[in-house]
Amino acid sequence: MDMRPSPRQQELMDRAYKLAMERFAPRAATHDREASFPIEDYADLHASGLLALCVPESYGGLGADFETYCLVAEQIARGNASTALTYNMHALTMLMIGPLMQGIELPPEVRERHEQLRIGN
């Protein structure tokens, strides 16, 4: 069994690691000291596309699975653990809410609204 990341996973891990080291790490101590939210880190995650890591590709996201999410989150934590923790809450919601809702019968208008909310509209 090959446990190495796939080429796509490695590319996403590298992208996250670069952000973590170059952008998040230099700001982390200030956020810890001031007990402030790392807003700049989220702007960087958005610009890199990683904020949409677990959003389905059909909605413009990267469509990552749980394993890929874990690999990326680990790299984010190298730069700022607080960013990784809050990113966890954001990204895992995208993974959890999709599959959970797929098996539930909903009126068409409710399902449509759910899908809009899922992609942030």
Where are these regions (language model features)?
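N-terminal capping segment at the start of a domain
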Residues: L19-A29
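Intrinsic disorder at enzyme termini
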Residues: M1-R8
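Glycine-rich flavin
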Residues: S36-A47, L51-N121
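Generic N-terminal segment detector
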Residues: E11-Y17
